Amino acid sequence: MQTIKCVVVGDGAVGKTCLLISYTTNKFPSEYVPTVFDNYAVTVMIGGEPYTLGLFDTAGQEDYDRLRPLSYPQTDVFLVCFSVVSPSSFENVKEKWVPEITHHCPKTPFLLVGTQIDLRDDPSTIEKLAKNKQKPITPETAEKLARDLKAVKYVECSALTQKGLKNVFDEAILAALEPPEPKKSRRCVLL
C-alpha cells in the first residue's frame, strides 16, 4: 500500500491539531494543548486503491524552529495553515512558513489552508479584530496569496463544524499524487 506523507505547518494556535483530530476521529478536541510533534495515519481509497495518508502535526511555536524541519524529509505534500481570523498568522505564511518549507523541500507541493472559518462571522471575534483595525481574511485575499506563493491551491475549513474539512485532505492527496514531474524527485530530502 502506498503511503502519502502530509506535514501540517503554521503558527501556534491556528488549529492544526484540531484539523487533524477532527478529520481522523470526527471529534473536536475541547482544550488547547500545544503540539511538539504528533502523527496520525488514515487509510483512504483513491480510484479503488487503498493509500495510507500519514499526517504529521508540527509545533508552530518559535521554540521548535530547529526541531520542526526534522519531520520534513520524504514529505509528499505540505498543508500551510493560518487562521482566517488571525491576520498575523496569515502574514506569517509569507514571512515564515512558505520560506521554511521551500528552503528544506523546494520541489514539494503545498496547499494554503485557511482554518477556523466558523469564526469569520462570529460577532465577538469580528469585534476583537475591529479594535485593532483588522478584519477576517477573505477567501479572495487568501487565493491571491496562494497564487503569488505558487501553492497548488487555497482551501479552507472549520474543524469545529467540519465544513470543508474532507476537501482539504482530498486536495492534499491529489496534490501529492498528481505528477507535474517524476514523483521520486518531488519528495523532500535533507542533505
Curated annotation (Swiss-Prot):
Record's subcellular location: Cell membrane; Cytoplasm, Cytoskeleton, Microtubule organizing center, Centrosome; Cytoplasm, Cytoskeleton, Spindle; Midbody
Binding of GTP, residues: 10-17, 57-61, 115-118
Post-translational changes noted in the entry: (Microbial infection) AMPylation at Tyr-32 and Thr-35 are mediated by bacterial enzymes in case of infection by H.somnus and V.parahaemolyticus, respectively. AMPylation occurs in the effector region and leads to inactivation of the GTPase activity by preventing the interaction with downstream effectors, thereby inhibiting actin assembly in infected cells. It is unclear whether some human enzyme mediates AMPylation; FICD has such ability in vitro but additional experiments remain to be done to confirm results in vivo. Phosphorylated by SRC in an EGF-dependent manner, this stimulates the binding of the Rho-GDP dissociation inhibitor RhoGDI.
Residues found modified as Cysteine methyl ester: 188
EC number: 3.6.5.2
Glycosylation sites recorded in the entry for this protein: 32, 35
Main location: membrane
Annotated keywords: Cell membrane, Cell projection, Cytoplasm, Cytoskeleton, Differentiation, Disease variant, Glycoprotein, GTP-binding, Hydrolase, Intellectual disability, Lipoprotein, Membrane, Methylation, Neurogenesis, Nucleotide-binding, Phosphoprotein, Prenylation
Phenotype for residue 32 to F: Abolishes AMPylation by Haemophilus IbpA
Protein family according to the UniProt entry: Belongs to the small GTPase superfamily. Rho family. CDC42 subfamily.
Function statement: Plasma membrane-associated small GTPase which cycles between an active GTP-bound and an inactive GDP-bound state. In active state binds to a variety of effector proteins to regulate cellular responses. Involved in epithelial cell polarization processes. Regulates the bipolar attachment of spindle microtubules to kinetochores before chromosome congression in metaphase. Regulates cell migration. In neurons, plays a role in the extension and maintenance of the formation of filopodia, thin and actin-rich surface projections.
Subunit organization: Interacts with CDC42EP1, CDC42EP2, CDC42EP3, CDC42EP4, CDC42EP5, CDC42SE1, CDC42SE2, PARD6A, PARD6B and PARD6G (in a GTP-dependent manner). Interacts with activated CSPG4 and with BAIAP2. Interacts with activated CSPG4 and with BAIAP2. Interacts with DOCK11/Zizimin2; the interaction activates CDC42 by exchanging GDP for GTP. Interacts with DOCK9; the interaction activates CDC42 by exchanging GDP for GTP. Interacts with DOCK8 (via DHR-2 domain); the interaction activates CDC42 by exchanging GDP for GTP. Interacts with IQGAP1. Interacts with NET1 and ARHGAP33/TCGAP.
Disease implicated: Takenouchi-Kosaki syndrome: An autosomal dominant syndrome characterized by macrothrombocytopenia, lymphedema, intellectual disability, developmental delay, and distinctive facial features.
Full protein name: Cell division control protein 42 homolog
Source organism of this protein record: Homo sapiens (Human)
